[in-house]
Swiss-Prot record:
Protein name (Swiss-Prot/TrEMBL): Flagellar P-ring protein
Primary location: periplasm
Function: Assembles around the rod to form the L-ring and probably protects the motor/basal body from shearing forces during rotation.
Signal peptide span: 1-28
Molecular-function GO term, any one: structural molecule activity
Chain intervals for the UniProt region annotation (Disordered): 295-316
Subunit structure: The basal body constitutes a major portion of the flagellar organelle and consists of four rings (L,P,S, and M) mounted on a central rod.
UniProt keywords, alphabetically: Bacterial flagellum, Periplasm, Signal
Organism encoding this protein: Desulfovibrio desulfuricans (strain ATCC 27774 / DSM 6949 / MB)
Keyword set includes Calcium: no
């Protein structure tokens, strides 16, 4: 599916790119790019830990949970210390997260993300102490530890500060070591199931037919708009990797519904390749209102014993752009954009126009506002 993104003040800037995208047919893609096998997924892990070695950019002294964590850590190490003697300026409380593939085995290394949960200003130069990462079942699957890599910096003084990117989030490449594998009998399944990332009946049926053609029999069938289930041929029992590798590299031409996505916060409009509109007349004008405040000072005459009076004044100017009706009929996305160009529509104008077209029934596509 070809997408056209309109973000700049004038739509015609994208005309050349749109023209190229419109003449291309729907592209064939690999099944692995639009679907995944059931059970073959990542599992999210999370844990709480401490980052030490910060250059005075850690949590402030009123971070009670950081003080409590430091006290508990010292106690576990057999070091008795009074909480009032602990300083937190070089320490930060953090949440540690990771994604663990279902096929990860003990000893596999994972990348971990470390995020500050207190009021630390930067994790630059910090070291994460050993942190247990748990799954939703409460069991420990990974231990994480190591030096952080931070993609930003932050520095401040009494009257000014400077920062670049986010310095309170860092990563540790390969910083997590899997201690427990996820119980999953990969080669003991009787069936395989493919899940589409975008639901569509046509694409699901097309994948089933493509798989059956490649396997030489009615092994696969679409059970709904997102799932395709298939029986495993006898020669692939207990040896499913060659079968899955063959299936995921088959080419299909995915079909999707016509859709327009609008982000009103940024003025971004994304139009799908199959968006159409019926013959309709459009006029879109801008109403510009300018309000200017001022003050008028009245001075009393000499020796009149009067007082200076300041009177506020307001000047209002209203200007409306008069635009003619334009007949637009979008057989293709290029024709639709050309028609909107003819009335001088900007992307933010386009949002209002598309909303109105949807209400009138002229927009033959789903309109989603995010």
């Amino acid at each position: 599916m070809k997408l056209t993104i309109l973000r700049h003040p004038v739509l015609w800037i994208f005309t050349a790119a749109l023209l190229l995208s419109m003449v291309l047919p729907a592209q064939a893609v690999r099944i692995k790019d639009i679907a995944s096998f059931s059970g073959v997924r990542d599992n999210q892990l999370i844990g709480y830990g401490l980052v030490v070695g910060l250059a005075g950019t850690g949590d402030k002294k009123d971070a009670v949970f950081t003080l409590s964590s430091m006290k508990n850590m010292m106690d576990r190490m057999g070091i008795g210390v009074d909480s009032s003697a602990l300083k937190t300026k070089n320490v930060a409380s953090v949440m540690v997260t990771a994604r663990m593939p279902v096929s990860a085995k003990p000893g596999t290394r994972l990348d971990v993300t470390v995020s500050s949960v207190g009021d630390a200003t930067s994790l630059l130069g910090g070291v994460l102490l050993q942190t247990a990462l748990k799954g939703v079942d409460g069991k420990i699957y990974t231990l994480a530890q190591g030096s952080l890599t931070v993609g930003g910096f932050s520095s401040q003084g009494r009257a000014a500060s400077v920062s670049k990117n986010i310095s309170t989030v860092g990563i540790i490449p390969g910083g997590g070591i899997v201690e427990r594998g996820i119980p999953f009998e990969f080669n003991q399944q009787d069936k395989l199931t493919l899940h589409l990332r975008t639901a569509d009946f046509s694409t699901a049926q097309q994948i089933a037919e493509r798989v059956n053609g490649a396997m030489g029999g009615p092994f696969a069938r679409a059970i709904d708009d997102m799932s395709i289930t298939m029986d495993i041929p006898a020669q692939y029992r207990n040896n499913m990797v060659p079968l899955m590798a063959s299936i995921e590299n088959l080419d299909v031409s995915p079909d999707t519904a016509a859709k327009v996505v609008v982000d009103e916060k940024t003025g971004t409009v994304v139009l799908g390749r199959d968006v159409r509109i019926t013959r309709t007349a459009v006029a879109h004008g801008n109403l510009q209102i300018t309000v200017q405040e001022g003050e008028q000072v009245s001075q009393p005459g000499p020796f009149s014993q009067g007082q200076t009076v300041v009177t506020p004044t307001t000047e209002t100017n209203v200007r409306e752009e008069n635009r003619h009706l334009v007949i637009i009929e979008g057989a293709t996305l290029q024709e639709l954009v050309d028609g909107l160009n003819s009335i001088g529509a900007t992307p933010r104008d386009l949002i209002s126009i598309l909303r109105t077209m949807q209400v009138s029934g002229a927009l033959l596509a789903e309109l989603e506002v995010i």
